[in-house]
From Swiss-Prot:
It comes from the Eukaryota. This is 5-aminolevulinate synthase, mitochondrial. It is an enzyme of class 2 (transferase). It comes from Agaricus bisporus (White button mushroom). One of its GO terms (biological process) is protoporphyrinogen IX biosynthetic process. One of its GO terms (molecular function) is 5-aminolevulinate synthase activity. The lineage of its organism: Eukaryota, Fungi, Dikarya, Basidiomycota, Agaricomycotina. The gene is hem1. Keywords: Acyltransferase, Heme biosynthesis, Mitochondrion, Pyridoxal phosphate, Transferase, Transit peptide.
Length: 621
């Protein structure tokens, strides 16, 4: 401790002023230098050091607790201790213990103070989605119900009746947990069946992870570490999971401007074709709603010897004739004609993508993530990625529900079409009211606010005064000054609910004096809003023909008195996937309240699937 002597002697006035808890602490000194905190050698005040102030407050609290403990001990000495836990005395006395070194609690408090100061502190709302009333949830009070307008359960599959039926049956037969990692007791027929189902992407193999965050992180970190001299090219707006995967590996990282092909090519040109290269990007960017130039990036990858890593998290279930994502959607007619065949379509965009990652936790209403690619690639990740090897596998019921959801959506187009119709309607109404929406071709509806405090206030007002839950999105999820309300419209939102959202949002904008689109135009624009020409070329990726608007087959938005429709053909096929493990199911579904009951007497034929026997299903009274 002798090395502290000289430093303490020059800080005596600081110590007297209440700086004692951090003076001569080199870690805190370094923290001060990084944060720009300057403590003078004389005339110091406790207010100049947030860590000292926090320490003083903690010390006062400790003294109060100690005094209370002494008083309680005195009372206990006079009476019986019967009924008290054995650890009571030790727990009481532990309040007297104090750190004599680094003040950890003050450090934690200081870090949180920074989040509060820049308005990026995250508040979690208590929202409990109701299976029988989607998209309605209750708050902490079960009697207080709100409409949810920011869920990533994009299609309402979290309470689809065939999904719930499958999960209940699986739970009854196989129990709750998986029992271990995939390598030790946690690799079952349900997991293997789900990975076979992910032939949806027409790839040779797939691998399921506990989440797509883990899938992205584990895959990119493993590839980056194993590929010799690898360089990863990353879109500046890539998700945190991809960024973490790159940070956890050893290769050089090159960041290119968002969706900027010219910038990407310029940077690719700087490396020999023989250098291993990965281009990591997304198909749908969730906070702005833009869609990546998937085909054009494939062109550059082939030209410069790179492989492509495409995150389809916010696209699977929503795009393409079978819900395989944007890569499938770009060759819509070819994939529609190919049907459920797992065989690749040579030359298609999806075939040209090397690695696809997706999630089970958004459009499919479950939890988990996955990768899809060549058999050798998937086997290498399975064999080397710690994020896969050392994690308990997903519960069988969850896996079965996810598989049923994928099958249902791959066989039924109506939910995807209706979602697009509702998204178009909400965007149209917002534009009429001059409410600023970040331009994008996808289903995401990002309403620009441009201020963290205002975004939080708007979210709070919508929830407390209008029973509408829309989460504010602040830094670091989006850049400072680009704070927004991210609205997600589902096929289960009714016309009346959409009208209520628009009306309430308009009122909140008026009450909080939030910038309208016209205001952003006068200010020069921000985040693509109010910038001349920024929205000119933005067209929905779903065409009128694909939605069914041209031939009159498009589904119609629901009214409040109407119930969502379950497609019984898709139900039949989804059920058939589990005939071997769970036994065939005949008769009616047990519908949730907001689904129409299947028509009595309807008969459907299930196709041969996974070598399982086709059967007739009759829905009877």
């Amino acid at each position: 401790m002798s090395h502290h002597g000289p430093r303490l002697s020059t800080r005596s006035q600081q110590i007297v002023a209440g700086y004692a808890s951090v003076a001569a602490n080199f870690d805190v000194e370094k923290l001060h230098r990084e944060q720009g905190v300057n403590i003078p050698t004389s005339g110091a005040s406790i207010n100049q050091c947030p860590h000292a102030a926090a320490a003083r407050a903690a010390a006062r609290m400790a003294d109060d607790l100690a005094s209370a403990a002494r008083a309680k001990k005195s009372l206990d000495a006079k009476g019986s201790l019967a009924g008290r836990p054995v650890h009571h005395k030790a727990a009481t006395e532990s309040t007297k213990a104090k750190h004599t070194g680094f003040d950890y609690e003050a450090f934690y408090k200081g870090e949180l103070a920074k989040k509060h100061q820049d308005k990026s502190y995250r508040y979690f709302n208590n929202i409990n989605r109701l299976a029988r009333k989607f998209p309605v949830a209750h708050t902490a009070n079960p009697r207080d119900e709100v409409e949810v307008w920011c869920s990533n359960d994009y299609l309402g599959m979290g309470n689809n009746p065939v999904v719930l039926e499958t999960m209940h049956r699986t739970l009854d037969k196989y129990g709750h947990g998986a029992g271990g990692t995939r390598n030790i007791a946690g690799n079952g027929a349900m997991h293997l069946g789900l990975e076979r189902e992910l032939r949806l992407h027409r790839k040779e193999a797939a691998l399921v992870f506990s989440s797509c965050y883990v899938a992205n992180d584990a895959t990119l970190s493993t590839l980056g570490t194993k590929l010799p001299g690898c360089v990863i090219f990353s879109d500046t707006m890539n998700h945190a999971s991809m960024i973490q995967g790159m940070r956890h590996s050893t290769p050089k990282r090159v960041i290119f401007k968002h969706n900027d092909l010219e910038d990407l090519e310029t940077k690719l040109q700087q490396y020999p074709k023989e250098t291993p290269k990965i281009i990591a990007f997304e198909s749908v960017y969730s906070m702005c709603g833009s869609i990546g130039p998937v085909k054009e990036i494939c062109d550059l990858a082939e030209q410069y010897g790179a492989i492509t890593f495409l995150d389809e998290v916010h696209a699977v279930g929503l795009y393409g004739p079978r819900g395989a994502g944007v890569a499938e959607h770009l060759d819509y007619d070819a994939h529609l004609a190919a049907g459920s065949s797992p065989d690749p379509i040579p030359g298609s965009v999806m075939d040209r993508i090397d690695i696809i990652t997706g999630t089970l936790g958004k459009s499919y209403g479950a939890v988990g993530g996955y990768i899809a690619g060549s058999e050798e690639f998937v086997d290498m990740i399975r064999s080397y990625a710690p994020g896969f090897i050392f994690t308990t596998s997903l519960p069988p019921a969850t896996v079965a529900g996810a598989r049923a959801s994928i099958v249902y959506q791959s066989e039924y187009l109506g939910d995807r079409q209706l979602k697009q119709i509702n998204v178009r309607e909400v965007k149209r109404r917002l534009a009429e009211l001059d409410i600023p929406v970040v331009p994008g071709s996808s289903h995401i509806v990002p309403v620009l606010v441009g201020d963290a405090a205002l975004a939080r206030a708007a979210s709070d007002k919508l929830l407390s005064e209008h029973d509408i839950y829309v989460q504010a999105i602040n830094y670091p999820t989006v850049a400072r000054g680009e704070e927004r309300l991210r609205i997600t419209v589902t096929p289960r939102h009714t016309m009346e609910q959409m009208e209520g959202l628009i009306r309430s949002l308009n009122q909140v904008f008026e009450e909080l004096n939030i910038n309208r689109l016209s205001d952003w135009k006068l200010a020069g624009g921000r985040a693509g809003v109010g910038i001349p020409g920024a929205a000119d070329d933005v067209q929905p990726i779903w065409t009128d023909e694909q939605i069914g608007l041209l031939n009159g087959t498009a589904p119609r938005s629901l009214r409040n008195a109407e119930k969502s429709v379950v497609d019984m053909r898709a139900v039949t096929i989804a059920r058939s996937r589990f005939d071997v493990l769970l036994g065939p199911v005949y008769g009616e579904l047990q519908p949730t309240e907001d689904f129409d009951t299947p028509a009595v007497g309807a008969t459907f034929k299930a196709p041969l699937v996974d070598r399982e026997v086709a059967h007739d299903i009759t829905v009877s009274a």
